[in-house]
């Protein structure tokens, strides 16, 4: 897939190509992270760029999306490890980053607006917003192919602190996302 895109970009003299990657490509511990790492190496070899993003807040297939659908179906919630932390970005911020960096060739672009959330706070916020019975949830436990927190590409070079969202912040964000996404689909 990646090689085909690079071949076509070269054939049609595409000025820059930005491949979407993930923070899971830094010190990868599973197949997904390793495949993204290898894709990054190939893209950079051809002098194109990488957008090494973090989790998109409430993207399709994300933990929030899965939990939301389980709650709406009145199913049990499955949780891996409440002690995990994840970095997130809003889709609007990601789009801004991509547009603002379209001319930056042969570079790894990292998100400019990110925030950190503890999985326990995310879980508690969602069940509060949706009034879900916590007795219908269970913890699977930590899995070997997951990290407690991902490593960012420029972790050592951050010149700003990454805000950590508390439950109040998360509840506001969940309510806004529900209003913008799910209500607008009705």
Residue ranges and their predicted role:
Residues 2-37, 48-49:
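Conserved Rossmann-fold NAD(P)-dependent oxidoreductase catalytic core, especially the SDR/UDP-sugar
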